[in-house]
């Protein structure tokens, strides 16, 4: 559990679980005699995170000081500087991923592949207010966004000597973002 005073009453605490599993397949008996296979591991994970990326005082009444003419003099005045957001909740991201780590030829060639699917709900954003309200913006939970993709990393030791080594690497990322819902 995580707590933050930045959120509305009743939403100050969030629970963000995570778990991961890995299976080092290369340690299995049926793969022990394959000399060119250095390592093979399958990974699976799920986790949630919460964001506190808002002003610490967004859910509190704030006053701004000003000056106003009263008669022939100036007086100090105070007025609300922001309108309170309604029921502000944690922006929560849940993600699962599956990955494969592969090392070949005494670990001279390494390949890492990952697929992930991420959903962020209760997105936090400033929202414009009507001018007649007397305020310009307020913070609200505005929607849900999805992000999924595939990432690949290939690394190879081209040259290895005692005092000099040359490693070549290339990566590829295919990512797609989509606004799933606005409210």
Describe the residue ranges of each PLM region.
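Extracellular/periplasmic, surface-exposed regions of secreted and cell-surface proteins
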Residues: 1-183
């Amino acid at each position: 559990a995580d707590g933050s005073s930045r959120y509305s009453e009743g939403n100050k605490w969030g629970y963000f679980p995570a778990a991961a599993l890995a299976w080092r397949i290369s340690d299995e008996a049926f793969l022990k005699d394959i000399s060119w296979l250095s390592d093979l591991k399958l990974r699976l994970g799920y986790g949630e995170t919460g964001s506190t990326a808002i002003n610490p005082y967004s859910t509190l009444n704030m006053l701004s000081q000003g000056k106003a003419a009263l008669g022939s003099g100036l007086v100090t005045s105070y007025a609300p500087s922001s309108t309170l957001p309604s029921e502000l909740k944690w922006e929560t991201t849940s993600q699962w991923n599956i990955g494969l780590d592969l090392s070949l030829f005494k670990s001279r060639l390494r390949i890492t592949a990952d697929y992930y699917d991420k959903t962020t709900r209760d997105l936090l954003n400033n929202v414009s207010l009507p001018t007649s309200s007397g305020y310009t913006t307020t913070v609200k939970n505005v929607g849900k966004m999805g992000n999924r993709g595939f990432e690949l990393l290939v690394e190879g030791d081209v040259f290895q000597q005692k005092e000099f080594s040359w490693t070549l690497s290339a990566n590829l990322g295919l990512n797609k973002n989509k606004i799933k819902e606005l409210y």
